């Protein structure tokens, strides 16, 4: 895994330089008109909320450095799922592992520390129990019996997550023929996904089948399940060139659109090959063909994996320097996240870090004390919380009886070892208060905070000649404050966990669709959209501050 983060070569500007000096002011005596007149629907806050999650790594797609026991009777080289399938007693070994690796105990513990999402890595062969034809023409064709029980466990996991108020990101970790050279892509053979048209077609079928199976399963539940937030089309793809992957991505999205049963498909998550700038520019330009819903769009999310322990440069850098680089707002890391978040947000999408850890080379550690790792974790969290729609730590745990505790990689070990915070996100101390008294209190807070923010905004821009519509700032502030409160009060599955807007740029873009003052006739953002956007973000942050003070 080559985890290299390159900065952008160009700056994505919020707006063009104004050519005229026109100003639209608001009377402080007249409350601004909000554009977001309806509260967020349940489907909205589930997909757009901040996802703070953990990968359930080595549950279905197995990795020997995480869990050794299932590999002990595998065929040589005993490093991949296919090797296990070829070995002795594979069916019994795998089903025992699936039934014991993540249990009610783990679900309860994850919820107790504020985790509200899980990412589940799957191989296409794990779907064969519901669609036997998915194995046709693939390496796993002879092993239907071994894997036929996986799909039932996967759907049980979706139900278990829902009971704890958690969303699920489904990740195609292993595609037919392997999309990268690592053994966690299903086999120990060389990667041959992108070089073989047959495998590319089988990969499209896998996405179609996965989408259909997920949607029909969720719709079959009473009430229907809404906690599938996204389908990640490929994990860490390593194409020979970008063109072949980008064409496949567009074709795969078309399969999602056709296969999803119902009106609202989940978000599309795209691995960006550690070429964040390039894939941001491309996905923004191609947003219409990448969005999961052909009529009204939806979320398109780039997935960046950030590790600092694999390259020679990383292993020769101290953890203190890694931490400083993350916190430096002028560094390539922060700038890249900011520019990607803002550019994709304007299109209707965002960025996440779906794999990260505090795994470090021994050469990077100085004191070998928990605090230096904790500082590194805190720095990462600060960046991801600021710019990303979500994050998922890699991974829940390692096989302790074999490998012992590992605070660098095992999430449970990291929390218990003080390397990761004991809880993340807002945790409610009081229940939802919909009384008239609370509405009046909240209205007073909004009015006071909005006026102060508006005065500062107007004063700052009064020094710079240009065309402005400050009324939009006030309207945005109002919408941001009210919408974030709607997210706070929208969660009902977990009495302590609190939802909040995660993909802010994308959510603002959704709220602006069809509003003449904010959107041009061709669907692009209007001249003064940036003022609404700035106001919305400030209002949302003010709501978070107020909610934390009053309810947490």
Where are the language model's segments positioned?
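An active-site-proximal structural segment forming one wall of the substrate-binding cleft
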Residues: 36, 97-118, 128, 134-174, ...
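C-terminal functional modules
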Residues: 402-405, 409-552
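Short amphipathic alpha-helices and their capping/turn segments at secondary-structure boundaries
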Residues: 38-48, 103-113, 157-162, 286-293, ...
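Aromatic- and acidic-residue-enriched segments that line the glycan-binding/catalytic groove
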Residues: 64-79, 132-144, 177-195, 408, ...
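Active-site region of glycoside hydrolase catalytic domains
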Residues: 31-32, 178-332, 339-362, 386-389, ...
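Short, solvent-exposed turn/loop segments enriched in Gly/Ser/Thr/Pro and often Arg
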Residues: 121-125, 173-180, 394-400
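Substrate-binding cleft of secreted/luminal carbohydrate-active enzymes
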Residues: 345-432
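N-terminal carbohydrate-binding accessory modules
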Residues: 2-116, 500, 504, 509, ...
């Amino acid at each position: 895994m080559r985890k290299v983060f390159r900065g952008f070569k160009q700056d994505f500007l919020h707006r063009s330089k104004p050519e005229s000096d026109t100003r639209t002011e608001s009377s402080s005596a007249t409350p601004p008109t909000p554009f977001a007149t309806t509260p967020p629907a349940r489907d909205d806050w589930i997909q757009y909320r901040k996802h703070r999650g953990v990968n359930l790594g080595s549950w279905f797609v197995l990795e020997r450095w995480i869990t050794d026991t299932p590999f002990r009777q595998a065929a040589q080289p005993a490093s991949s799922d296919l090797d296990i399938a070829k070995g002795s007693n594979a069916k019994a070994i795998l089903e025992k592992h699936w039934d014991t690796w993540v249990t009610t105990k783990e679900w309860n513990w994850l919820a107790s520390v504020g985790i509200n999402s899980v990412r589940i890595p799957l191989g296409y062969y794990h779907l064969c129990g519901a669609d036997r034809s998915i194995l046709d023409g693939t390496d796993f064709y002879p092993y239907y019996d071994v894997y036929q029980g996986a799909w039932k466990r996967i759907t049980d996991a979706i139900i278990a997550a829902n009971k704890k108020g958690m969303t699920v990101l489904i990740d195609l970790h292993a595609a037919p023929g392997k999309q990268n050279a690592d053994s966690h892509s299903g086999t120990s053979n060389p990667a041959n996904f992108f070089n073989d048209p047959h495998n590319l077609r089988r990969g499209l079928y896998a996405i179609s089948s996965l989408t259909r199976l997920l949607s029909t399963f969720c719709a079959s539940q009473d009430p229907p399940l809404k906690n599938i937030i996204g389908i990640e089309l490929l994990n860490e793809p390593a194409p020979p060139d970008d063109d072949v992957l980008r064409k496949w991505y567009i074709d795969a999205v078309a399969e999602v659109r056709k296969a999803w049963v119902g009106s609202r498909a989940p978000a599309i998550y795209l691995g960006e090959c550690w070429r964040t700038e390039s894939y941001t520019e491309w996905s923004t330009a191609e947003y219409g063909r990448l969005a999961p819903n052909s009529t009204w769009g939806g979320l398109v999310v780039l997935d960046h994996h950030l590790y600092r322990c694999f390259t020679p440069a990383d292993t020769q850098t101290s953890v203190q320097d890694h931490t400083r680089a993350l916190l430096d707002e002028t560094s390539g890391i922060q700038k890249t996240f900011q520019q990607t978040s803002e550019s994709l947000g304007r299109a209707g999408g965002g960025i996440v870090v779906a794999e990260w850890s505090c795994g470090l080379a021994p050469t990077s550690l100085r004191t070998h004390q928990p605090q230096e790792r904790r500082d590194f974790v805190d720095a990462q969290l600060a960046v991801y919380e600021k710019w990303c729609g979500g994050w998922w730590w890699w991974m829940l745990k390692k096989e302790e009886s074999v490998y012992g505790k590992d605070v660098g990689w095992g999430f449970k070990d990291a929390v218990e070892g003080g390397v990761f915070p004991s809880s993340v996100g807002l945790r409610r101390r009081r229940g939802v208060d919909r009384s008239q008294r609370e509405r009046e209190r909240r209205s007073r807070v909004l009015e006071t905070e909005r006026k102060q923010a508006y005065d500062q905004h107007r004063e700052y821009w009064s020094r710079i000649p240009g065309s402005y519509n400050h009324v939009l700032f006030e309207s945005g502030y109002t919408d941001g404050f009210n919408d974030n409160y709607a997210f706070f009060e929208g969660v009902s599955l977990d009495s302590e966990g609190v939802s909040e807007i995660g993909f802010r740029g994308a959510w603002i873009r959704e709220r602006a669709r069809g509003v003449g003052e904010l959107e041009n006739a061709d669907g692009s953002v209007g001249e003064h959209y940036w003022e609404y956007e700035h106001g919305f973000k400030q209002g949302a942050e003010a709501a978070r501050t107020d909610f934390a003070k009053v309810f947490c």
